[in-house]
Amino acid sequence: MCIRDSSNNKPHRLLEHGVIKADAALCQKLGLTAENPYVYKIVRCVDVSSEVDEVDYSYVPLSVCKDHTFDCEALKTFFLHDYICRYFNEKPTHIRIFVDTPLTSDMELSLLNAPPEKLFSWDTFLYHGNQVLAVTTTVSMPKENRPFITLEF
């Protein structure tokens, strides 16, 4: 099943969204060409105890979302995977997560109040077959004894 109950999700604060021209590193991540480097960028953060805990930079190629009008309220509630499942025709078939990934030139990290070398990042790629539907780079300040992934059975 694609859609999960999002009531337990940490609410996101939507900071920015709109079309941008992807830099070379982002084009490479998404498999975009120099002739069509445009993506829809969504920047959200999660606050814990009035401090920014993580910042999510999500990018959806315009070839995937060209006729879609993004629902800002839903972007605050749903994980991007669930949003794409609900609103897009192409449904994700799998994800891949890479840790300690390079950051792109459009990322503003001052919200995290930490030097870049202290930050931890990971990329979550959403695929439909071999097609990249979206990528989210999450940047966070590591904290001791904090669970990174919880798997439920």
Describe the function of each predicted region.
Residues 1-5:
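Conserved small/polar residues in nucleotide/adenosyl-binding loops
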Residues 11-153:
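C-terminal all-alpha effector/ligand-binding and dimerization domain
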Residues 8:
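Amphipathic alpha-helical segments that line or abut small-molecule/effector binding pockets
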